[in-house]
Amino acid sequence: MVYKDIDRTTEDFRRILCCAKHFAKQGKLVVMPPKLDVPYKNSAYDVIYGSLKGTAYYGKCPDLMVDNVWYEHEGYNSENPKTNFSNMCKRGLRQSDRIIVEDCGLTDGYLKRNILIRQNEGQQIKELWVKKGNILRLIYKAE
């Protein structure tokens, strides 16, 4: 389900829609909610994002919900792959502990090691997916 208030003209919309289609093809229920400018002042926030209440992400607007679990997609704009990945994780983890990042050319081994280092530093990461073109790959899932 895509909310009618979403700006469908952005490149970000197309990337997130690609992610949504990936999960929907697996038979999962996918919701693409709108971004709300000032969530805590918007009465629709609790209706749409109410499941975030009581979490560190309450007041945030993650990009999509898959089977009642929130995911955040992040892209990049630098030429340095390691900087790109670091920035995507940093921004994504502000919205959700399940993130989808654009492929920046790093190996799966590097990505997994980086996630383990972040977890040892106390960051909560439940899933990491990499999107390359129209394909999503699960790199890490917490047990």
Where are the predicted features?
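Metal-dependent nuclease catalytic core centered on acidic motifs
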Residues: 1-49, 55-58, 76-143
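A short, glycine/Asx- and small/polar-enriched loop/turn
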Residues: 57-60, 67
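Conserved catalytic cores of phosphodiester-cleaving nucleases, focusing on short active-site segments
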Residues: 64-75
